[in-house]
């Protein structure tokens, strides 16, 4: 499997905008190459049930499936990987518990990016590229900060934070392997169409 290729258009769920299952189905129809289930403060059983359904859907569309934060849920639903932030389980511990999971690390600076790569992350989610409503306290690194990270690490980098169809091109031109979006897809009236538009831009720039 070519991980870089599978990270091109990475769509993250947000139940404040849309229920998970239907929106993920539409995003996959629109060409999402990876899905991350991001559910904060839900019972583990609920996360497990939704995760199982999303795992099935992503398999049907040959997309990668990641779970945010929860290594246990990722293992239970047979996800491809887990996304870990600075306050989540340490990367090296997750690798020990779940050696077969693809580990993505959320990083907000060049220092954090280098540290995550050293600890064994398989790819980075780097941002926030622009200010974002989804995470109002996010540190903004801008296109320049993103470019520095891309130039300094060997592992794939996915850009995140305030990315939409209007700025996706300039983000992709920094050399990233893909873009991660929440509001640009989950906040759209037509999830499938919004995903298709972004996929078209991704293909134009990355091929």
From Swiss-Prot:
It catalyses: 2-[(2R,5Z)-2-carboxy-4-methylthiazol-5(2H)-ylidene]ethyl phosphate + 4-amino-2-methyl-5-(diphosphooxymethyl)pyrimidine + 2 H(+) = thiamine phosphate + CO2 + diphosphate; 2-(2-carboxy-4-methylthiazol-5-yl)ethyl phosphate + 4-amino-2-methyl-5-(diphosphooxymethyl)pyrimidine + 2 H(+) = thiamine phosphate + CO2 + diphosphate; 4-methyl-5-(2-phosphooxyethyl)-thiazole + 4-amino-2-methyl-5-(diphosphooxymethyl)pyrimidine + H(+) = thiamine phosphate + diphosphate. Condenses 4-methyl-5-(beta-hydroxyethyl)thiazole monophosphate (THZ-P) and 2-methyl-4-amino-5-hydroxymethyl pyrimidine pyrophosphate (HMP-PP) to form thiamine monophosphate (TMP). Binds 1 Mg(2+) ion per subunit. InterPro entries: Aldolase_TIM, ThiamineP_synth_sf, ThiamineP_synth_TenI, TMP_synthase. Belongs to the thiamine-phosphate synthase family. Its cofactor is Mg(2+). It comes from the Archaea. Mg(2+) binds at residues 69, 88. NCBIfam families: thiE (TIGR00693). Gene3D superfamilies: Aldolase class I. One of its GO terms (biological process) is thiamine biosynthetic process. Keywords: Magnesium, Metal-binding, Thiamine biosynthesis, Transferase. GO terms for cellular component: cytoplasm. 4-amino-2-methyl-5-(diphosphooxymethyl)pyrimidine binds at residues 36-40, 68, 106, 135. It is an enzyme of class 2 (transferase). HAMAP family: TMP_synthase. Its EC number is 2.5.1.3. Signal peptide: none annotated. This is Thiamine-phosphate synthase. It comes from Pyrococcus furiosus (strain ATCC 43587 / DSM 3638 / JCM 8422 / Vc1). 2-[(2R,5Z)-2-carboxy-4-methylthiazol-5(2H)-ylidene]ethyl phosphate binds at residues 132-134, 162, 182-183. Pfam families: TMP-TENI (PF02581).
């Amino acid at each position: 499997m070519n991980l870089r290729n599978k990270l091109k258009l990475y769509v993250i769920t947000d139940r404040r905008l849309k229920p998970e299952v239907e929106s993920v189905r539409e995003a996959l129809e629109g060409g999402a190459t990876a899905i991350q289930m991001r559910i904060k403060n839900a019972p583990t059983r609920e996360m497990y049930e939704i995760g199982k359904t999303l795992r099935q859907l992503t398999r049907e569309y040959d997309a990668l499936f990641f779970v945010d934060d929860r290594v246990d849920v990722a293992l239970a639903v047979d996800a491809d990987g887990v996304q870990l932030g600075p306050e989540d389980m340490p990367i090296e511990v997750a690798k020990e518990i779940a050696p077969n999971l693809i580990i993505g690390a959320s990083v907000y600076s060049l220092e954090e990016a280098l540290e995550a790569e050293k600890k064994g992350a398989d790819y980075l989610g780097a941002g926030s590229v622009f200010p974002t409503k989804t995470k109002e306290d996010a540190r903004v690194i801008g296109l320049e900060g993103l470019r520095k990270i891309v130039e300094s690490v060997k592992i794939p980098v996915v850009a995140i934070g305030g990315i939409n169809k209007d700025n996706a091109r300039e983000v992709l031109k920094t050399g990233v392997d893909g873009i991660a979006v929440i509001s640009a897809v989950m906040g759209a009236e037509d999830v499938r169409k919004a995903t298709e538009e972004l996929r078209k831009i991704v293909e134009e720039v990355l091929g």
